[in-house]
Amino acid sequence: MALKQFNPTSPGQRGLVLIDRSELHKGRPEKKLVEGLTKSGGRGGNGRIAVRFRGGGAKRLYRLVDFKRRKQGVATVVRLEYDPNRTAFIALIKYQADGELAYILAPQRLKAGDEVVTAEKVDVKPGNASPLRTLPIGTIIHNIELKPAKGGQIARSAGAYAQLVGRDAGYAQIRLNSGELRMVLDTCMATVGAVSNPDHMNQNLGKAGRSRHMGRRPHVRGVAMNPVDHPHGGGEGRTSGGRHPVTPAGKPTKGAKTRVNKATDKFIIRSRHKAKKGR
């Protein structure tokens, strides 16, 4: 979908660039496939801030998206919809065998009336899903499982995709957008194509209020705070913080590695950090 640019008829319109969603469904979502969503305000289970600068925003219903794609058969795309809970669009599909409805992530170039297939072996068409062991090498894929039957975890955001580059000894090798090359079991499911809404990154909301509608609060710099609030806070007059950049908890930020799961290091053939250095 294209971008919509607005004339500067008011300060809030100046510079405004939004996604043109005129081709999406304009009604309410499928009632059986939504449930209520309680806002957390960025707080965790103990009531403390877990993610800063979150809170408020418009009410949402959570769409129950099928990330597993384990139901075999042919389904017809009923319509494409906006989903406030993610950057990608979603597609309402209807299985031809029993009429069951489901939401899936909408890939690029998928439209109402198209057919999507979930099977052991499928054609390389956007929206079709199958295990990695049967997809041709070089296929562009998204919604990739890390563990069989757990549901897709990789490449689910707007415009995201990965590429299947090889297979060896029961594992598939996939190259991610970050440059990382990693192995996953070839029994894991993946969906053909790249995720919809690639222009999401080119939006300009134009004013702070639109960010607030999305539940984002102002992002305050540490050097603008008091010492009690942040390690960079305080000082007479404007300061640069006086130390290497850290988080509010005092841990290094700006590029410090945070990965701690050494058990899965063996599945990463080439780190995304090495990929960047090699360019």
Curated annotation (Swiss-Prot):
Keywords: Ribonucleoprotein, Ribosomal protein, RNA-binding, rRNA-binding
Compositionally biased tracts (Basic residues): 269-279
Any GO molecular function: transferase activity
Gene Ontology cellular component terms for the protein in this record: large ribosomal subunit
UniProt keyword annotation of Acetylation present: no
Entry-linked SUPFAM superfamilies: Nucleic acid-binding proteins (SSF50249), Translation proteins SH3-like domain (SSF50104)
Pfam families reported for this sequence: Ribosomal_L2, Ribosomal_L2_C
Region called Disordered, residue ranges: 222-279
Signal peptide segment: none
One Gene Ontology biological process: cytoplasmic translation
Keyword Ribonucleoprotein listed: yes
Sequence similarity: Belongs to the universal ribosomal protein uL2 family.
Role according to the record: One of the primary rRNA binding proteins. Required for association of the 30S and 50S subunits to form the 70S ribosome, for tRNA binding and peptide bond formation. It has been suggested to have peptidyltransferase activity; this is somewhat controversial. Makes several contacts with the 16S rRNA in the 70S ribosome.
Subunit structure: Part of the 50S ribosomal subunit. Forms a bridge to the 30S subunit in the 70S ribosome.
Protein name, per record: Large ribosomal subunit protein uL2
Species for this entry: Caulobacter vibrioides (strain NA1000 / CB15N) (Caulobacter crescentus)
Lineage: Bacteria, Pseudomonadati, Pseudomonadota, Alphaproteobacteria, Caulobacterales
Gene behind this protein: rplB
